[in-house]
Amino acid sequence: MTLIDTPLIETSLIDIGANLTHDSFDHDREAVLQRARGAGVGRMIVTGACRAHSPRALILAQTYPGELFATAGVHPHHATEYTDECDAEMRALHAHPEVVAVGECGLDYNRDFSPRPAQRKAFERQLQLAADTGKPHALKPLFLHQRDAHEDFMAMMKNFDGRLGPAVVHCFTGTREELFAYLDQDWHIGITGWLCDERRGTHLRELVKHIPANRLMIETDAPYLLPRTVRPQPSHRRNEPMYLAHIVEELARDRGETVEAVAASTSATATAFFRLPPAAAAT
């Protein structure tokens, strides 16, 4: 096996978005987790993005307690599957403490894999779910997706103003105006390996300087978005949580901070946002 150059970081990292239910991990999922541990990734949030995979995310979280946690939701690409039955299934999933956020949900007008009216309906229903979930104690956070749908996205979120818990706009790749609109709402920002892409991510290198440390989190979005700074590039092109440190390294360079400072702040922010147990309590 070819050795991959991965930055060494002492602080235990948290990957807030890894699609570990993806079938590309079916043959070596345990090895993927072992490599993540070896690269300093102590906890991972497994993204639930459709009706079929959200229950699988929960099963993974239950299989690896304290290390894996889950979200449950329906990505806009799958919006047409959000029926009454699906809504009931999602609400049942959110009764489990291992499910720590509502989503991935939102709007995607870039690819339009689902009709836009269906996307808006599914998003609205999941916002209602989020408004209902966690009462009377604490509302669960939202794990949000937005591509080329900023105006509708903001309008729909505004309709639920004051009724939702904290929110993170995952895999942020947008404009300065979008970033500041999100920060003005006190939302969090998830940064992926898009930042490491010299072809399409260079604008982010200036924008990440403006994200307060207590609003910034990191994610691989594995198996997608393999950082282009990984050397050598694996032939299979599959991203894994083990590569999370490459995002930390680029963030540190762009923000003028040390790698350890970025690692510590993003882990502390993720722990608070998802209400995770302290790292020392993780098994």
Where are these regions (language model features)?
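Mid-domain alpha/beta scaffold segments of enzyme catalytic cores
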Residues: 1-283
